[in-house]
Amino acid sequence: MLDSLKQKKNFQRIKMRIKTGDLVKVINGKDKGKTGEVLKTIPLENRVVVKGINLRTKHVKPTQEGETGRILTEEASLHASNVMFFSKDKNLTSKIEYFIDKEGVKKRRLKKTGEVID
């Protein structure tokens, strides 16, 4: 699917405000209300993979003789619009905005509280 997205003429990369390692809360879907750490971002599809959220079971057949099949559980991706940044210190969710500090460095902060993330 990624190759088909890259081949489009008017393709633009989606700018994501959520990054790998951020703590997010699911705001929509079957796992609504759960929090987890972002393991991977997929900017081309505007999706994120969150630890312990949106688990899928995968049945794996044995590949060699004498080996048994197994059932794996792995995280599937979520659309980035279904998660929101979660602040552990303030215990709230908030949108993220970018700003340039006094030294001229671009940083992120929470819109609700003004807390600087990085």
From Swiss-Prot:
Q: SUPFAM superfamilies, per this entry? A: Translation proteins SH3-like domain
Give the UniProt family note.
Belongs to the universal ribosomal protein uL24 family.
Mind telling me which GO cellular component terms the entry cites?
Answer: ribonucleoprotein complex; ribosome
Keywords from UniProt, A to Z, are:
Ribonucleoprotein, Ribosomal protein, RNA-binding, rRNA-binding
Oligomeric state and partners?
Answer: Part of the 50S ribosomal subunit.
Q: Does the keyword DNA-binding apply?
A: no
**What's the gene?**
rplX
Q: What does this protein do?
A: One of two assembly initiator proteins, it binds directly to the 5'-end of the 23S rRNA, where it nucleates assembly of the 50S subunit.
Q: Which InterPro entries match?
A: KOW, Rib_uL2_dom2, Ribosomal_uL24, Ribosomal_uL24_CS, Ribosomal_uL24_KOW, Translation_prot_SH3-like_sf
Task: Please report the name of this protein according to its UniProt entry.
Answer: Large ribosomal subunit protein uL24
Q: Identify the PROSITE patterns for this entry.
A: RIBOSOMAL_L24
Query: What is a single molecular function from GO for this protein?
Result: structural constituent of ribosome
Q: Which Pfam families match?
A: KOW (PF00467), ribosomal_L24 (PF17136)
Has UniProt tagged this entry with the keyword Cell inner membrane? no
Q: Which GO terms describe its biological process?
A: translation
